[in-house]
């Protein structure tokens, strides 16, 4: 690798490429003279489109191939949507930078209805997420929830073709792709608690690559990193992947971290909720403590069913 070149491993979806270009532009602005190249790749999660993600199984469906490129020195960094990043990393790799968070909320998208509550009974709602599914089913058990896979453009096309009455997407993804006008309503966290890390972009690299880590330091956003640390600590203790019915959202309010989380049965019949408030330096411990509370209050049994009988210890 040339001293002035940095290679970014990225998925090829429009949203992934937006994220990679975002990081590229930030790096070049912070380090004039640096040449940044994109290394587009296809992941397992991009290829398996006819099966709900929860049934595909495995963690890191959208990141593994990028990590192999890092380990084989075909790329220097991998740029991820934080909600896709597993809680464990291959030996020698780690998450070193978290960029400033975009709006973390879920978006209600429909051509005919202004809000979730305006949908008539029996309406078909599309989502690929068990987390969204369980919260939708709890609030509106009279709706029909169907799996929805593919990139943002594909999902919107299926809505426009009449396959769904409404779909749920991430506000951040729509905004980044210039599709903010498609959002009928942003769902507040009390209606649809976001995924761990939703709206944040994370950067992974080889932990022994000091030069790259120094280049990335300027992109780290301290407040976002604190919030995501609390959310991910909770998820790690729950052994959650990106396809389990777990929601978590942390905010910094008046110098304190407020952390909310839930674990839900996919059919919405039971949702275990909890929250914590504490000092920023205790972010990780707060996440672990909240996870323990959820497990003790019934989340262990819910997750055992989702994980085919293998509950978190």
Swiss-Prot record:
It comes from the Bacteria. Its cofactor is dipyrromethane. It catalyses: 4 porphobilinogen + H2O = hydroxymethylbilane + 4 NH4(+). Its EC number is 2.5.1.61. The porphobilinogen subunits are added to the dipyrromethane group. Binds 1 dipyrromethane group covalently. Tetrapolymerization of the monopyrrole PBG into the hydroxymethylbilane pre-uroporphyrinogen in several discrete steps. One of its GO terms (molecular function) is hydroxymethylbilane synthase activity. One of its GO terms (cellular component) is cytoplasm. GO terms for biological process: protoporphyrinogen IX biosynthetic process. Belongs to the HMBS family. InterPro entries: HemC (IPR000860), Porphobilin_deaminase_cofac_BS (IPR022419), Porphobilin_deaminase_N (IPR022417), Porphobilinogen_deaminase_C (IPR022418), Porphobilinogen_deaminase_C_sf (IPR036803). Monomer. The modification S-(dipyrrolylmethanemethyl)cysteine is found at residue 242. The keyword Ribonucleoprotein does not apply. This is Porphobilinogen deaminase. Pathway: Porphyrin-containing compound metabolism; protoporphyrin-IX biosynthesis; coproporphyrinogen-III from 5-aminolevulinate: step 2/4. Keywords: Porphyrin biosynthesis, Transferase.
